[in-house]
Amino acid sequence: MRIIALLAAILLVALQVRAGPLQARGDEAPGQEQRGPEDQDISISFAWDKSSALQVSGSTRGMVCSCRLVFCRRTELRVGNCLIGGVSFTYCCTRVD
């Protein structure tokens, strides 16, 4: 599992380096300001079904969550997806006692 976590970290760094600075898109308003490299952030979106949402009770308070490449660990619950650099990862949480 440590190897998978290390490979995931290397993949994320490689994606960030490859992405470079944000480019202005044709669908943006002409007067819209372009963000510099220091203003870039990672967008994480969550999408889960009702059964997962009920298990989490609408919050991840008291839980430790992380984005995994494919599968959650045996002690974790799959809550949704993380979208990092255009790549979808599995969002997994485990309860903290």
From Swiss-Prot:
Residues 1-19 form the signal peptide. The three-dimensional structure formed by the three intramolecular disulfide bridges is indispensable for effective bacterial killing. Disulfide bonds join C65-C93, C67-C82, C72-C92. Expressed in neutrophils (at protein level). Expressed in bone marrow. The keyword Iron-sulfur does not apply. Changing R74A: Decreased antibacterial activity against E.coli. Weakens interaction with B.anthracis lef and with HIV-1 gp120. Changing R78A: Decreased antibacterial activity against E.coli and S.aureus. Weakens interaction with B.anthracis lef and with HIV-1 gp120. It comes from the Eukaryota. GO terms for cellular component: azurophil granule; extracellular region; extracellular space; Golgi lumen; specific granule lumen; transport vesicle. Pfam families: Defensin_1 (PF00323), Defensin_propep (PF00879). GO terms for molecular function: protein homodimerization activity. Host-defense peptide that has antimicrobial activity against Gram-negative bacteria, and to a lesser extent also against Gram-positive bacteria and fungi. Exhibits antimicrobial activity against Gram-negative E.coli and E.aerogenes and Gram-positive S.faecalis, S.aureus and B.cereus and the yeast C.albicans (in vitro). Interacts with pathogenic surface proteins and toxins, such as HIV-1 surface protein gp120 and B.anthracis anthrax lethal factor lef. Protects blood cells against infection with HIV-1 (in vitro). Inhibits enzymatic activity of B.anthracis lef/anthrax lethal factor (in vitro). This is Defensin alpha 4. It comes from Homo sapiens. The lineage of its organism: Eukaryota, Metazoa, Chordata, Craniata, Vertebrata. The gene is DEFA4.
